[in-house]
Amino acid sequence: TGQMLFMRAYQYGEMIVYHGGMPYITKVQDKDKDDLFVTRNSTAECFDLLIKDLDDAISLLPAKAKGNDYGRIDQCFAKAYKAKMLLYKASPQFNPSNRYDNKYWNEAYEAAKEAYDFCISQGIKLTDKYSDNWLVDGNSEVVFPIIYSNPDKTAGWENTIRPASLSRSNANNTPTWDMVKAFPMLDGKSFDDPTGKYYVGNEDVFLQRYWMNRDPRFEDCILYNAALYPVSGTSTGYRQYTSVGIAVREDSYGINPNVGSTATQNDVISGMYVRKGSDVSLSQDLVSTFDHDYPFMRLAEVMFIYAEAANEVGHRDVAVDMLKQIRKRAGIEAGEDGLYGLKVGGREEIRQAILDERNVELCFEGHRFMDLRRTRNMMQLNGLQKYGIEAIAINEDGSEMTITEAQRKANSYLLTPENFKYVLRMVPISAIAENKFLIQESYYFFPIQESKILENPNLEQNNNWGGTFNPTME
């Protein structure tokens, strides 16, 4: 019963964050007696019913699923999900006119504190190594896993991120230049922060050395041109090249006219690949057997929820402590002030630090889009474009290396990242200059499908999509 109550709350929770209030059905409907043309509950009513379902589930669930029950819902996950939903309830997405001083933040804080403290009491803790989250099943940080086991159930992750030459498919999930810039330097500060130990100046200078002195998570998450990539079955010292004419066509990115070769995936990839979660012990022929568990929720996310709510209700010491723990585990230098490069001078600065750290720590885990919606920051993307990085081999004097010489050196893995110059290219390369983000206010809540409204005329459409239903808490 506890499992089913949680699943009902979870299913409704996922609908609420996309659409606002939905018809929240709490009893089995009888097609002969009940009116099946139900109306939408208000968003406030849905949150109340969802939290009641979670509280009832928590009272019935074991503290922590162990042994043969590992992978089943337990109190740790239910409490953490409750905190996550109350964070949404308090968020700007649902409270556009009173974003950070509404009464719901205290409720979110209490739930987040309870979830964090309970997880810690059950032995959940940050892993020593960041990469263990993806490559060590049953690690200490997992709050709830999605379990995979070859051959019964495998994950397609490896096929979506690897270069085509080492996979059985073409990568369709690649980083952008903005994601590269988001990672701090080794001292925790931005590359363009003049107070930083590793300050490099402006973006043009940084582009030519973007892989140097970075947050260690950068190496764990981003596979860049000429980086070592010891995939099983490759030669000793193998480097993954992306430069046109040097890398195989399916792996290359760019439009260098001096090469005499063209890249075939310019409209799909970005000159970089995702390294996060890549199991290099799998050779190309075994890539489809990838079966590491996926950490659907891990302690770091719970800590971010706790930090965000704590900051908004005045417990800024708690928020900063959560961020420091995460950066310490990442391997960032503490600095003389022990702040790991964080800018945490006040409520607004801490708020931004939390969102920035979420972007890095949780990258490629499916959170960023929802974070931008939840905080009503999506429209900050308007007018921006996506960029990838083309690598072009150069000589010591900076002149462009002949393709014959570049190929000869690359065949022996003698070309390192320093032996290239880097140029930003629009993603996709075929895009026109006007291909920029244009986010509408209406995107913070999605519409109900027209087909569903035709099936049930009592379903109101959202007021930002031509209807009358208010999906917010206001």
For each predicted feature, which ranges?
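C-terminal low-complexity, acidic/polar tails when present
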Residues: 219-302
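Short, well-ordered loop/turn and helix-capping segments at boundaries between secondary-structure elements
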Residues: 21, 117-121, 149, 224-227, ...
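An aromatic- and glycine-enriched ligand-binding surface/loop that stacks and positions planar moieties
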Residues: 55, 72-79, 84-255, 380-407
